[in-house]
Regions:
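Active-site-proximal, structured, solvent-exposed surfaces of multi-pass membrane proteins
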Residues: 234-402
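Conserved luminal/periplasmic juxtamembrane motif of membrane-embedded glycan-processing enzymes
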Residues: 1-240, 286-287, 304-327
């Protein structure tokens, strides 16, 4: 928006009193213009919040970042550990805002920006994160170890005082309620994959476990599913103060007649050991609680379909996802849970980590490095492509295929 301020012309021969009145009139016009501009900005901000369904409560200086000085200490320690590393990414287990990385000075994933690259948005949606190609944002939540492979996530920051260590993240330090976790299956900005990865259509991906199975196979060449779904006899859907009018063994549920305090609970029984994630599609943007064997892990709210991490489980463990419903609410929801095959994942990680991109120079417009290839393949990088990047291999131009 461009605003033009008019210049006041004062005729010759008028009195000083008339000049003062003219200046006062000009100042009133400017004040009205400023008020109008602020009103337009306010309306635009409210419209943005409504249109994009942001579910972040108001954040003031006193409670940002979550964990305050403890979180600042964790971030400082993280960079001390990585003093010789030219680039890596970090994220929080649960977002406080969509621009936590930019606000706290680390390279993150979540973003809310008017210049969001639609291809990156589609890529994030395909990996199971909260994203939509008509929105200008995407949100990282602690999720799938498979997705983390392709994002260069080396660290996660936990800010609620909880123990978030698992098979795939080790706690390396703690300051008060904030802790730093390192990815035990970390892959850097670039690494060698199988050529078939270039044929995978990320724009058609919808964040499901099946897409991640296809992604894992295309990248590693391991033609076995890395995710095993919990469904059929391993799933029970119950309504508490809500009438379940339709459901199936794969996680679809239709409900109505909700009373105050109603909920729909999905109970999964693990039929094997492993790391569990859940994919949720909640059109009503409900609050939900995640519990294992009756112990509540966390509460969350999402505004778009998203995959989230539950954690390590043992055979026979029960995972409850309790979805809260408003009074008189009626809608549908679809949830699915799956257990990661640790042995297959480890084999795939070994293949992908064999030939890594070792950075020698890094700037916002230049990435240089070396790769000691153990085979022919496709060099994958998690550099967001905006049409301005070009690639050279051994000094010769190379095709960007993905």
């Amino acid at each position: 928006t461009v605003m033009l301020y008019g210049q006041l012309e004062v005729p010759e021969g008028i009195t000083e009193r008339q000049k003062m009145r003219a200046r006062a009139k000009r100042n009133r016009q400017r004040a009205r213009t400023r008020i109008l501009a602020l009103s337009v900005m306010g309306v635009e901000l409210v419209s943005t919040l409504v249109c994009f369904g942001l579910y972040f409560t108001g954040t003031g200086v006193s409670n940002y970042p979550k964990g305050t000085t403890y979180t600042a200490s964790v971030i400082r320690y993280m960079y001390e550990r990585e003093d010789d590393n030219l680039f890596f990414r970090a994220e929080t287990t649960h977002s406080q805002t969509l621009n936590d990385g930019a606000l706290n000075g680390y390279n993150g994933i979540s973003a809310f920006t008017s210049s969001a690259n639609v291809r990156v948005t589609e890529f994030m949606r395909a990996l199971g994160y909260g994203a939509k190609n008509t929105y200008n944002r995407y949100c990282f939540e602690e999720s799938s170890p498979v997705a983390n492979l392709f994002l260069g996530i080396k660290y996660m920051i936990e800010r609620d005082g909880k123990d978030k260590s698992s098979t795939y993240f080790d706690e390396v330090n703690r300051f008060g309620v904030a802790s730093l976790l390192v990815n035990t299956a970390y892959l850097p900005l670039g690494f060698l994959t199988e050529p078939e990865l270039a044929d995978l259509d990320f724009s058609a991906g919808n964040g499901t476990f099946q897409f991640q199975n296809d992604l894992f196979t295309a990248a590693t060449g391991i033609d076995e599913e890395v995710w095993h779904k919990l469904q059929g006899e391993n799933l029970a859907i119950t309504g508490n103060g809500a009438d379940i009018t339709e459901s199936n063994s794969t996680g679809y549920c239709k409900y109505s007649g909700c009373v105050s305090g109603a909920n729909v609970t999905y109970t999964y029984t693990a039929d094997r050991d492993g790391f569990v994630c859940v994919h949720l599609n909640l059109p009503k943007r409900n609050d939900f609680y995640v519990s294992v064997n009756g112990v509540e892990l966390y509460k969350e709210t999402i505004s778009l379909p998203q995959m989230i991490a539950v954690g390590d489980v043992k055979t026979g463990d029960t995972i409850d996802i309790r979805v809260e419903c408003d009074k008189d609410e009626s809608s549908t929801m679809t949830l699915s849970a799956a257990v990661l095959n640790g042995e297959r994942f480890a084999r795939g990680y070994e293949i992908l980590s064999a030939s890594r991109l070792n950075l020698t120079r890094f700037r916002s417009t230049l990435v240089e490095g070396t790769v000691d290839c153990d085979r022919d393949g496709l060099l994958y990088t998690s550099v967001p492509q905006n049409g301005n990047w070009s690639v050279k291999v051994d000094g010769k131009p190379a095709e960007i295929r993905l």
